[in-house]
Amino acid sequence: MTKHIAILRGDGIGPEIVAETVRVLDKLIAQGLDVGYEYAPLGGEAYDEYGHPYPEFTQNLCRKADAVLLGAVGSPQYDNLDRPLRPERGLLAIRKDLNLFANLRPAILYPELANASTLKSEIVAGLDILIVRELTGDIYFGEPRGIRVLENGEREGYNTMKYSESEIRRIAHVAFQSAQKRSKKVCSVGKANVLETTELWREIFEEIGKEYPDVELSHMYVDNAAMQLVRAPKQFDVIATGNIFGDILSDEASMLTGSIGMLPSASLDENGKGLYEPSHGSAPDIAGQNKANPLATVLSLAMLLRYSLNDEARAQQVENAVQKVLQQGLRTGDIYEEGTKLVSCSEMGDAVLATL
């Protein structure tokens, strides 16, 4: 049965990197992949067309699709809009609407890019971490929240950090099941010494861990985890954490690899439906200049094939094509170094197609 993908170009470099990735998708379809796709706007593009960053047309298409592929959202020209209308709110809205509670962010250092990391190569060579971040709870979505005026006239900002047992259980299963396909280690990260939210988190992870006796479970405070990611990152396999801690740690881990332009991400629901996007932003400073690195988006397509279409063979085919391109010495500006060949966004896309 034909699977359907909703493709959201987004803002900034989004249309360029998505265009190169769709060329890869088209070639896979020509080779026999039974998939159809349709475009819809999200973020600033959607606001310009519909007056809302996540309009009804996009909602309906994404709800019906088996998976969603996104470029990037956000641009300075929208910074003065009311908060609910800003492009980034469209991304939050689609995660909530599709109940995408599990964010998977790999941090992989390809051997060809070992010199791109700011850390010594012996510390990061062979790095392969997966950060599993809970995406729909925690302080980003907790109520009540707001800014209020106190009796003394001073203003106070407040937010609510909270997690339910069921929210923790389902992300724990994702973390342990991911670890089973890797090196069978989960490190649960929180701040259980001062936060009741993560005290419960730790308790539930211990409970769920008993269902996965082949996976080693450890716990770490978030401040120590941030330090250990820089000191000895290869000790980690799967890091499982809440929304706000995961937001910070996944960005930190991404820079161990030298360029966030290489890193894909997946956000999944309980049935494997997912939103796939590069970890980087919309980079409006280079938008429209054919300079962007499309490889994170291409690798996001590989994750889509793996997690939503259960097509491991084609996922590996795409990942191998990316590695071959790097072995050929081709580099966009963000990963360029002396002795390699600087190429444009579309030239990188050409190279991936040629090796696919």
Swiss-Prot record:
Disulfide bonding pattern of the chain: none
GO biological process, one term: L-leucine biosynthetic process
Binding site for substrate: R95, R105, R133, D223
Domain of life: Bacteria
Pathway terms, separated by semicolons: Amino-acid biosynthesis; L-leucine biosynthesis; L-leucine from 3-methyl-2-oxobutanoate: step 3/4
Entry binding sites for Mg(2+): D223, D247, D251
Keywords recorded for this protein, A-Z: Amino-acid biosynthesis, Branched-chain amino acid biosynthesis, Cytoplasm, Leucine biosynthesis, Magnesium, Manganese, Metal-binding, NAD, Oxidoreductase
Family: Belongs to the isocitrate and isopropylmalate dehydrogenases family. LeuB type 1 subfamily.
PANTHER family to which the protein is assigned, alphabetical: 3-ISOPROPYLMALATE DEHYDROGENASE
Annotated protein name in UniProt: 3-isopropylmalate dehydrogenase
Species this chain originates from: Neisseria meningitidis serogroup A / serotype 4A (strain DSM 15465 / Z2491)
Lineage: Bacteria, Pseudomonadati, Pseudomonadota, Betaproteobacteria, Neisseriales
